[in-house]
């Protein structure tokens, strides 16, 4: 048995302008090469563009987009008797949000366009409306889990 204690779960800090944890999670995921100020600039520009496009609160659009992309269930590869099965597992809220943010950023990076702020704002607006690559990724994950439902007892 391990003598080591369990690690405390870290709570995400909130960003300086919007005082929102989701914005901070987004900033930390978009971060490259330690350039946090650039990451903040990209996120704030994207939120400003969302404000201009939708004429609503950009934070509510962000929340709606993340809620729409967050998966309830995912598949995990599990080796049983020499063969690998895709076993569906339920996902907690924190892990689901992290996956949603990763998918949103991945989809916005793949988009054609001028700059990252523009691409991210477009992807967030699309996800809030229920379309876009990130939503497609969620539906694909749910489809995979449904197809492999027979292996759920391998959990």
UniProtKB/Swiss-Prot annotation:
Quaternary structure and partners: Part of the 30S ribosomal subunit.
- List, in alphabetical order, the Gene Ontology terms for molecular function in this entry: mRNA binding; rRNA binding; structural constituent of ribosome
InterPro entries annotated for this entry? Ribosomal_uS7, Ribosomal_uS7_bac/org-type, Ribosomal_uS7_CS, Ribosomal_uS7_dom, Ribosomal_uS7_dom_sf
Query: What top-level branch of life does the organism fall under?
Result: Eukaryota
Q: Which organism is it from?
A: Arabidopsis thaliana
Ribosomal protein recorded as keyword: yes
User: What's one GO-annotated cellular component?
Assistant: thylakoid
User: What's the protein name?
Assistant: Small ribosomal subunit protein uS7cz/uS7cy
Pfam families noted in UniProt: Ribosomal_S7 (PF00177)
Keyword Aminoacyl-tRNA synthetase (UniProt): no
Q: Where in the cell is it found?
A: Plastid, Chloroplast
HAMAP family assigned: Ribosomal_uS7_B
């Amino acid at each position: 048995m391990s003598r080591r204690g369990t690690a405390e779960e870290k709570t995400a800090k909130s960003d300086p302008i919007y005082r929102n944890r989701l914005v901070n999670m987004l900033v930390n995921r978009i971060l490259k090469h330690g350039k946090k100020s650039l990451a903040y600039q990209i996120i704030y520009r994207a939120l400003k563009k969302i404000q201009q496009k939708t004429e609503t609160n950009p934070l509510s659009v962000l929340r709606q987009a993340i809620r729409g992309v967050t998966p309830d269930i995912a598949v995990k590869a599990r080796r049983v008797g020499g063969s690998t099965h895709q076993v569906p597992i339920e996902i907690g809220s924190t892990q689901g949000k992290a996956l949603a943010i990763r998918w949103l950023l991945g989809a916005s990076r793949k988009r054609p366009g001028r700059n990252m702020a523009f691409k991210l704002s477009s992807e967030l607006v699309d996800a809030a409306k229920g379309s876009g690559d990130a939503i497609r990724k969620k539906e694909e994950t749910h489809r995979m889990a449904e197809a492999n439902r027979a292996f759920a007892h391998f959990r």
